[in-house]
Amino acid sequence: MNPPKPFPILCLLFLAIEEVFKALDPIEIINFSIISKRTKGIAKQMSFFPKYSMGLFINETLDIMFCGTGDMVSWFYAMTSDIKMDGKIEEDESDGCIIRRVFKYSKDPVEEWKQLFKHVREIFKKQTIDVLRITVDSFLGQNVSIIEYLKVNMKSVDLCYLFQTNYINNVDKHTAYLLDNIKIISELTHYLYTENYDFDGKIPKNLQHLCIYNSQWFGFERLLIHDETKEISGGIDIRKIDGKTATFFVHYTGFSMSVH
Ligand SMILES: *[C@@H]1O[C@H](CO)[C@@H](O)[C@H](O)[C@H]1NC(C)=O
Ligand SMILES: *[C@@H]1O[C@H](CO)[C@@H](O)[C@H](O)[C@H]1NC(C)=O
Ligand SMILES: *[C@@H]1O[C@H](CO)[C@@H](O)[C@H](O)[C@H]1NC(C)=O
């Protein structure tokens, strides 16, 4: 039996190619775009990509995440150093949303993820990232290089979530370095066990939501430097420079702030 005839997508007219692309998911688009210079060039011309929001998730693997507006599926392209996972596809469901994760093995996952993200950012024309979720004590040896890379390759991140796996690891310096180098626009949620009272990381200004757990180290003065404050029941109100009000709630595990 003859092998199936390949579909000559590159011979189609541009509008027809675009229709074919609309039927592809982001992982298929990436796979197509890395075949050759020509396929990359074609992928770059597609106009409908802005509908995807994009995230970077760093934990045991380094993932690039896509989420379409409207459809309840998110796709993860995960770089792993575990060869047994190569080519595996995991499917999960969370809050009615389907999560599809494709694994790719690499001897040097950090390096390959960096290259892939650069490529993807170019194809999907993204200057900013919607979500950054980092377990700061994963890839410890490459902590600085990952942050420097992010600093150069994305303008800002909208939502940022910081985690830590092992409370024994001191991540104070790492976290301060991250906060100094990455611009966070609307939300920072922080689950780290920072305990160093000298922690001198900069907390981003103008956030709509700030949530810090395990925050024994955290001096309120750090937040109060620029604003007018008064205590109200159930929280501390801060009138921000832009006229909005932020309310702080102190919990036994930490505190949170929301702007309204
Ligand atoms: C990181 O990966 C570990 C192991 O798979 C998992 O237990 C943990 O929940 C993950 N952390 C985050 C923040 O996703
Ligand atoms: C895309 O490429 C990855 C990595 O090579 C592979 O595991 C996956 O099966 C491919 N996915 C599709 C939908 O072609
Ligand atoms: C990077 O991680 C190492 C531990 O592997 C730590 O000693 C160092 O302080 C960290 N540096 C920064 C800037 O995060």
What does each model-found stretch correspond to?
Residues 1-260:
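Non-core capping and flanking segments associated with repeat-based/extracellular domains
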